[in-house]
Amino acid sequence: MSQSIYVQGGAGLLHARQYGAIRTAQVPLIVMHGVTGHAGLWHHVATALSQNRAVIALDMRGHGLSDWCAQQDYATPAHVQDLACLLEALGQPQYDLAGLSWGGLVSLQYAACYPERVRRLAVLDVEPSFTQSEHEVMARPANFPSRAAVMEYERKANPQAPQSLLQLFAYESVNQVDLNLWQRRHDPYFLRRWPFRNDDVWAQLEELRCPTLLLHGERSFVRLAIMQEMHDRLRHPAGLYELPDTGHLLPLEAPEPVAAYLEEFLTAD
């Protein structure tokens, strides 16, 4: 089970799902999704990991139940500021971070900026820099005639996802605005622009002081060779692991292996 929490971010209210209670003896884990995603992506992983710690899954600004930014300030540093707001509100001295795709870039940059606040970091399926511009966005439908159509779309994109998790993810990805009209639950801005394409975090990657785990999906468009180079440049590498027959959305298509890798990493000596 999870409960919704809201905190004030840099441009409005931020929504997050908290799984499990914060315990004095256990560092909380913060998990973050990627562009056009939402906190529900992590539901199965967070449920599994919350047996031993609190897990908080954040809806990034402009996504899920978090407020949209009126100024459309969606650059990665703005999300780092939001993450700082969430962690300050939670009031713990240290955190573990795990982020998929854009969430991985946000988590990495936070860890580089606030090394004393991050105990361990996991970065899932992302490259540190990009050749594409922020306007080169993969086409995707903005609207659907039914939730069944959303499910059909997400099943094609994520063929290995467990049915129950895929349904949760798909249904929470849209809002019903008319009898036969469902719209994506994120700012339409992200159908046109992906501002993280301006990021280059190689230098920050090399500055990380915490143990860092990397996970890659075998079917992902993210290049394994680039993630291997990331691993080679880390000060404190904790391994690079590829999940077989898994696409870009690792927590959605392979929640059990992701949870297992994270549990082992977070409890290592």
Language model region names:
Residues G34-H44, V55:
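Serine-hydrolase catalytic-loop signature spanning alpha/beta hydrolases and amidase-signature enzymes
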Residues L108-A112, R119-A148:
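Flexible "cap/lid" loop of the alpha/beta hydrolase fold
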Residues G99, G103, S107:
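Gly/Ala-rich beta-loop-alpha elbow adjacent to hydrolase catalytic centers
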Residues P141, P145-D199, Q204:
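Conserved alpha/beta-hydrolase catalytic His-Asp/Glu region
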Residues G10, R17, R23, H44-T47, ...:
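Active-site loop/oxyanion-hole signature of alpha/beta-hydrolase fold enzymes
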Residues T246-P255:
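Catalytic histidine-centered segment of alpha/beta-hydrolase-like enzymes
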Residues D178-R233, E242:
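Conserved serine/cysteine hydrolase catalytic core
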Residues M1-L29, Q51-R53, P93, G239, ...:
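Alpha/beta-hydrolase fold catalytic core
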